[in-house]
Amino acid sequence: MPTIQQLVKSARQKLVNKTKAPALKSCPQRRGICLRVYTVTPKKPNSALRKVARVRLSSGFEVTAYIPGIGHNLQEHAVVLVRGGRVKDLPGVRYHIVRGTLDTAGVKGRVQGRSKYGVKKVSAKSAGKSK
């Protein structure tokens, strides 16, 4: 424990919070270009083929971003919007691609949690016509 004299000479240092998404440079989202779209396997004990993309952001960073939802239309050179948010069972994946913006289509047939997957509301009229 420091003495009062030591505290007078130099005050206590404030702890600096480290950002969890440094590539976004304090912005909520960033635009980027897909360099490679591929699948990776998660850590134990999970098993799957998770869809991810290597993205070069407008901030100059190159990051790995997760593609949420079932099915996607992303290819190399697609322009995407990237937000923060890690995927717990994929080491090194600290970003998510936003569905339903720029070149990324929304998830087809999604009815619940639509806002997270870029899907417009299906009205009762149009739902009746499709059957």
Curated annotation (Swiss-Prot):
Assembly and partners are described as: Part of the 30S ribosomal subunit.
Q: Which GO terms describe its molecular function?
A: rRNA binding; structural constituent of ribosome
The record's listing under InterPro entries reads: NA-bd_OB-fold, Ribosomal_uS12, Ribosomal_uS12_bac
Q: Which GO terms describe its biological process?
A: translation
**Gene Ontology cellular-component terms listed:** chloroplast; small ribosomal subunit
Known role: With S4 and S5 plays an important role in translational accuracy. Located at the interface of the 30S and 50S subunits.
Q: Name one Pfam family in it.
A: Ribosom_S12_S23
Query: Which compartment or compartments is the protein found in?
Result: Plastid, Chloroplast
HAMAP family attached to this UniProt entry = Ribosomal_uS12_B
- Give the intrachain disulfide bonds: none
Give me the gene this protein comes from. rps12
Describe the family membership recorded for this protein in Swiss-Prot or TrEMBL.
Belongs to the universal ribosomal protein uS12 family.
Q: Which UniProt keywords apply?
A: Chloroplast, Plastid, Ribonucleoprotein, Ribosomal protein, RNA-binding, rRNA-binding
Name of the protein in its database record = Small ribosomal subunit protein uS12c
Task: Just give the chief location class.
Answer: plastid
